[in-house]
């Protein structure tokens, strides 16, 4: 044992122990040499749960999914060099979707920076504005002052990551060789006795009485709507429904709002606005005086377009993290306040005669017509097209299941075809940067928390993150993946690019002609190709009770999918015109 080894051990033990005391329970480690002491010390910790992922990009998204589902800070650790750069997509997503990640990158010591040393690059501020905070840690020392320094930075990292708005932080550790710490006796048997831990307390932002009364006055007796985008706070669901009923306002609920699948059916929850807000005649009849928006912007483009064209209204955005989530620049009142506090205080102060019944009836009538058409069309069709896949998932998913939703077409199909249901289905997606990368790994991370967990994903997105399946094989994780294989970029069929046939297939359609049964075999997954509705039902039913990785592939046609969507919209439009 050398003094260097003791210094290294004491310094890193103080830091890691404080991470755990502050609330970290899991660490995702990407193997490497320079990160050896941190990896060994984390593995040695008696409480910390370790996952090892050899692909850094997959590791980043696995940590993201785990942190998203658990709402706890999760640690990421990698060696020096380009390994850290591979975390960048997950870090960017964590920043935009406010997920607490603590990214630890090992680095060469200062004397080996910018001198051509192997596996060394500039890692200072590597993630730029995509992290809430960056620290280039001091070289290890074990004086009392430096042990307090290491401990302090452990607490601070968790605090910053968890403080509203939540997000990623980055700590860079320069480390000199030799890199192996002392593990016998365990470095964690005495650290708690040597140092007091930092206790972290969080508060909720509230509004002053005058602001509350002003908002109540502005909303009383007015025609208003709640718009609820992606927001993962189940404690808001029932209070929001209760307030909407008291006001007589509809709730335009994105699939990721939680309100379509929180275990109850409420007519104030509007789930088919994407269909009827396309119609100019209906839009003219649905002009609110007040909008209160919670969460990020919903996925629906017709809803976005409708909100953009509203004028001379009061438009509240409730944003406790001060992130200014207002891409359409419509806000008149930015409310930096805890959402639950606002709902409760408005409920308490709102008079009982505050609602306009006719206003709500208009919304619920249109929604009922559109929903009944969607449900009837899906019940009557025997063709296993993309909408039918979502409808079958809605019908077959067991109560309290989790559903991770891929970007591009899957989230939009869920918006259209996953109507409100009286089961509790936890829906998750990466809707910060909205990328198609890392979705498999994110779903696997979430599966650590939610069971049973299902993933609905497109073929290109699945291909993009097949490496993530190694975690399922290695740790025997339970996940059912439903691949909607339309052989390419199906969403582009709905976009203006589809009108340029000369280059459409080569640049946007991007057919791969991959057969995913071989990927399933490679990662020891049970594979099912569903060619009919009955086969899909059988595969989902089997997967619901099977422990392990299941891959269900459904091959669809991009052109038919577009035609089916358009036919559905026409049918809904005709029915709504007849209603008037």
From Swiss-Prot:
It catalyses: isochorismate + 2-oxoglutarate + H(+) = 5-enolpyruvoyl-6-hydroxy-2-succinyl-cyclohex-3-ene-1-carboxylate + CO2. Homodimer. GO terms for biological process: menaquinone biosynthetic process. Its cofactor is Mg(2+); Mn(2+); thiamine diphosphate. It comes from Listeria monocytogenes serotype 4b (strain F2365). It comes from the Bacteria. Binds 1 thiamine pyrophosphate per subunit. Pathway: Quinol/quinone metabolism; 1,4-dihydroxy-2-naphthoate biosynthesis; 1,4-dihydroxy-2-naphthoate from chorismate: step 2/7; Quinol/quinone metabolism; menaquinone biosynthesis. The keyword rRNA processing does not apply. The keyword DNA-binding does not apply. Catalyzes the thiamine diphosphate-dependent decarboxylation of 2-oxoglutarate and the subsequent addition of the resulting succinic semialdehyde-thiamine pyrophosphate anion to isochorismate to yield 2-succinyl-5-enolpyruvyl-6-hydroxy-3-cyclohexene-1-carboxylate (SEPHCHC). Transmembrane segments: none annotated. Belongs to the TPP enzyme family. MenD subfamily. One of its GO terms (molecular function) is magnesium ion binding. It is an enzyme of class 2 (transferase). Keywords: Magnesium, Manganese, Menaquinone biosynthesis, Metal-binding, Thiamine pyrophosphate, Transferase. InterPro entries: DHS-like_NAD/FAD-binding_dom (IPR029035), MenaQ_synth_MenD (IPR004433), MenD_middle (IPR032264), THDP-binding (IPR029061), Thiamin_PyroP_enz_TPP-bd_dom (IPR012001), TPP_enzyme_TPP-bd (IPR011766). This is 2-succinyl-5-enolpyruvyl-6-hydroxy-3-cyclohexene-1-carboxylate synthase. Its EC number is 2.2.1.9.
